[in-house]
């Protein structure tokens, strides 16, 4: 007997779809759930950017978690600075009121009922030269000009100048009571070229010293309650060694920034770092747009001595955080929903106009209603 065979070739389903290398970097916008392709992409990304080991003594910290920590620390420090400025302003006001004795007399005169008979301004002779001047107790000149702010040498008093609190000193120093200590374990030359804002230069060769291998900041943050130490480099090669050595020496609150500057440059191209990012940390260019980006980053620029993030930097970090956490599919879904809602509104307006026209010509509408709608 002959065996029955199905219709068609059995190898037809195994035939591969030809792929165009020109569009290999284009990804689909449709989320089909977990798949082998996504799993392989995650493994490939972890192999390129991270160096996981089975016997790691240290703990890891994601770049996105560090960005959230930076935003929280900056917001809390700004609130504390505003409170300090308000307290300083209140203290200055109190010192002004205490330095002007004429305000007590003025408050006594204006607190109750108005006194019609005010004494004329008395002239007093304070200077040895015999110049006459008005007394601050009997006139409003001291209140108008502001006692303690204007030069009062004419009345024989010393000038009281209020120096404003300089905000430049606060921006040039690190955050007070910062919960994290960021250490750059690369060489000093690489640190001067590019580093993360608020990071200290702590080369790994410092750990090999026999005398004073730790700085004052490291000793202050070592196993302190509510504080952590974060080490990083470009690609986890040096940072993993430094973190292992420090953990072996008794550092229990030590973390390593996963991915280092390489992942920081990929997820936060702006706002997180200062200076020119090394070429090895830049993402591989894809197409003409990528080539233009690499050409722009070739201009070397030395890193600035920044201890705090500016408002513009924080806005950029927040923007890139939203891009990381909010997938791109939501925007496409939102646009599709908006398009469908607009289509429905247009259909409703067209239906209302048709209803009005049908009311005007009821006889023709009745005759057309029997016909099938196409």
From Swiss-Prot:
GO biological process: angiogenesis; axoneme assembly; cilium assembly; neural crest cell migration; protein polyglutamylation; protein transport
Disulphide bridges: none
Cited InterPro entries: CEP41 (IPR051889), Rhodanese-like_dom (IPR001763), Rhodanese-like_dom_sf (IPR036873)
Record domain Rhodanese: where: 176-273
Ranges of compositional bias, category Low complexity: 329-349
Keywords noted in UniProt: Cell projection, Ciliopathy, Cilium, Cilium biogenesis/degradation, Cytoplasm, Cytoskeleton, Protein transport, Transport
Keyword hit for Cytoplasm: yes
One GO CC annotation: centrosome
Cross-referenced SUPFAM superfamilies: Rhodanese/Cell cycle control phosphatase (SSF52821)
Family matches, as Pfam families: Rhodanese
GO MF, one example: tubulin-glutamic acid ligase activity
Subcellular location: Cytoplasm, Cytoskeleton, Microtubule organizing center, Centrosome; Cell projection, Cilium; Cytoplasm, Cytoskeleton, Cilium basal body
Keyword Protein transport: yes
Family named by the database record: Belongs to the CEP41 family.
Function: Required during ciliogenesis for tubulin glutamylation in cilium. Probably acts by participating in the transport of tubulin polyglutamylases between the basal body and the cilium.
Protein name: Centrosomal protein of 41 kDa
Organism in which the protein naturally occurs: Danio rerio
Gene that this polypeptide is encoded by: cep41
């Amino acid at each position: 007997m002959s065996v029955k065979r199905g219709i068609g070739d059995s190898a037809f389903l195994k035939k591969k779809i030809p792929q165009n290398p020109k569009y290999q970097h284009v990804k689909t916008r449709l989320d089909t759930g977990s798949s082998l392709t996504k799993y392989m992409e995650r493994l490939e990304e972890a192999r390129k950017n991270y160096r996981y080991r089975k016997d790691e003594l240290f703990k890891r910290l994601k770049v996105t978690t560090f960005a959230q920590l930076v935003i929280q620390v900056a917001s809390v420090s700004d609130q504390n600075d505003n409170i300090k400025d308000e307290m300083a302003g209140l203290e200055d006001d109190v010192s002004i009121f205490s330095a002007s004795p004429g305000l007590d007399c003025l408050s006594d005169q204006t607190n109750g009922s108005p006194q019609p008979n005010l004494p004329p301004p008395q002239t007093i002779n304070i200077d040895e030269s015999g110049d006459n001047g008005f007394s601050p107790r009997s006139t409003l000149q001291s209140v108008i000009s502001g006692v303690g702010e204007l030069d009062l040498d004419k009345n024989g008093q010393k000038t009281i100048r209020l120096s404003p609190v300089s905000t430049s000193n606060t921006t040039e120093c690190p955050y007070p009571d910062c919960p994290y200590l960021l250490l750059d374990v690369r060489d000093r030359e690489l640190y001067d070229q590019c580093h993360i804002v608020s990071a200290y230069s702590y080369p790994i060769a410092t750990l090999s010293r026999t005398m004073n291998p730790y700085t004052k900041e490291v000793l202050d943050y070592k196993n302190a309650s509510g504080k952590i130490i974060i080490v990083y480099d470009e690609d986890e090669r040096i940072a993993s060694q430094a973190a292992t050595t420090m953990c072996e020496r008794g550092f229990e609150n030590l973390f390593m920034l996963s991915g280092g500057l390489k992942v920081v440059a990929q997820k936060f191209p702006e706002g997180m770092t200062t200076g020119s990012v090394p070429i090895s940390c830049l993402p591989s260019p894809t197409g003409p747009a990528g080539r233009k980006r690499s050409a722009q980053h070739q201009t070397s620029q030395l890193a600035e001595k920044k201890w705090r993030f500016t408002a513009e930097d924080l806005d950029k970090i927040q923007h890139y955080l939203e891009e990381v956490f909010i997938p791109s599919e939501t925007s496409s879904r939102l646009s599709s929903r908006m398009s469908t809602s607009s289509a429905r509104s247009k259909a409703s307006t067209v239906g209302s106009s048709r209803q009005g026209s049908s009311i005007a010509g009821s006889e023709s509408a009745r005759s057309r209603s029997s016909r099938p709608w196409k």
